[in-house]
Amino acid sequence: MARSKTSQRWLKEHFDDPYVKMAQRDGYRSRASYKLLEIQEKDRILRPGMTVVDLGAAPGGWSQVTSRVIGDRGRLIASDILEMDSIPDVTFIQGDFTEDAVFARILEAIGDHPVDLVISDMAPNMSGVRAADQPRAMYLCELALDLAGRVLRPGGDFLIKIFQGEGFDQYHKQAREMFDKVQMRKPLSSRDRSREQYLLARGFRGE
């Protein structure tokens, strides 16, 4: 079957992408690793010994970065609907985050340990129809914020991929009510044509 012009363009962009080449060189599973590395360089959200939850983790780029920083004393719980090859000392839970049973399994894996940081690079399968994609993306963001509100220690941080559009302003307001400081980040490694940004919320206020 002949490839469409769109898929041909994506393949050319992918293989010409310097971050794809860097990921291959540096041993990262995904170019997305560099988005987290850029944010880490600027904001220092990861530290040795932390307990971290990584949502939308597959294929494991963010988990690799996180694991390398938090080290042996740290704890990382990762989850995705897709399979992910194992990473040493990472607890992985496969399943649909929107399902109550999977949400409960993540909470069970966390247990009574206070979480220092929740990170999420989740996104729904995009149809290209913004009116359909945006609500689905925001629903994932809302679930992630709900999880963060349940498991973060006071003073903990939250980083999430989010798309500008319907529901964004309300979400931003909700995050400001829950955290001391909320900032937006657009890493250089995020593709120019992408609407994605990252919301960084610091200083969870707790109950």
UniProtKB/Swiss-Prot annotation:
PANTHER family: RIBOSOMAL RNA METHYLTRANSFERASE (PTHR10920), RRNA METHYLTRANSFERASE 2, MITOCHONDRIAL (PTHR10920:SF18). The keyword rRNA processing applies. Belongs to the class I-like SAM-binding methyltransferase superfamily. RNA methyltransferase RlmE family. The active site is at residue 161. The keyword Transferase applies. It catalyses: uridine(2552) in 23S rRNA + S-adenosyl-L-methionine = 2'-O-methyluridine(2552) in 23S rRNA + S-adenosyl-L-homocysteine + H(+). S-adenosyl-L-methionine binds at residues 60, 62, 80, 96, 121. This is Ribosomal RNA large subunit methyltransferase E. Keywords: Cytoplasm, Methyltransferase, rRNA processing, S-adenosyl-L-methionine, Transferase. NCBIfam families: PRK11188.1. InterPro entries: RNA_methyltr_RlmE (IPR050082), RNA_MeTrfase_FtsJ_dom (IPR002877), rRNA-MeTfrase_E (IPR015507), SAM-dependent_MTases_sf (IPR029063). Its EC number is 2.1.1.166. Its main location: cytoplasm. It comes from Pseudomonas aeruginosa (strain ATCC 15692 / DSM 22644 / CIP 104116 / JCM 14847 / LMG 12228 / 1C / PRS 101 / PAO1). GO terms for biological process: RNA methylation. GO terms for cellular component: cytoplasm. Specifically methylates the uridine in position 2552 of 23S rRNA at the 2'-O position of the ribose in the fully assembled 50S ribosomal subunit. Pfam families: FtsJ. It is found in: Cytoplasm. GO terms for molecular function: rRNA (uridine-2'-O-)-methyltransferase activity.
